[in-house]
Amino acid sequence: MEKNREIISKNNINVEVFLIRSLIGKLNKKVKVLKALGLNKIGDKKVHFLNQSIKGMLNETINMILLSEVSNV
């Protein structure tokens, strides 16, 4: 299984974002980024097309998420 940083370095792929850490006690900026990604509570999953704006959002919250590459969506 690839690590988060290896997946973020790729371009134009679909990634599944999985929230693995709680939002409680986190900086308000990080909470807003995660909610913009569609992740509200632990265990939420969303599929996003990996472009520059999504990469920035994922880099901001890299320690709270788990990424996996999705082939067909």
From Swiss-Prot:
SUPFAM superfamilies: Ribosomal protein L30p/L7e. InterPro entries: Ribo_uL30_ferredoxin-like_sf, Ribosomal_uL30_bac-type, Ribosomal_uL30_ferredoxin-like. Coiled coil: none annotated. GO terms for biological process: translation. Keywords: Ribonucleoprotein, Ribosomal protein. GO terms for molecular function: structural constituent of ribosome. GO terms for cellular component: large ribosomal subunit. Pfam families: Ribosomal_L30 (PF00327). Belongs to the universal ribosomal protein uL30 family. Part of the 50S ribosomal subunit. This is Large ribosomal subunit protein uL30. It comes from Borreliella afzelii (strain PKo). The gene is rpmD.
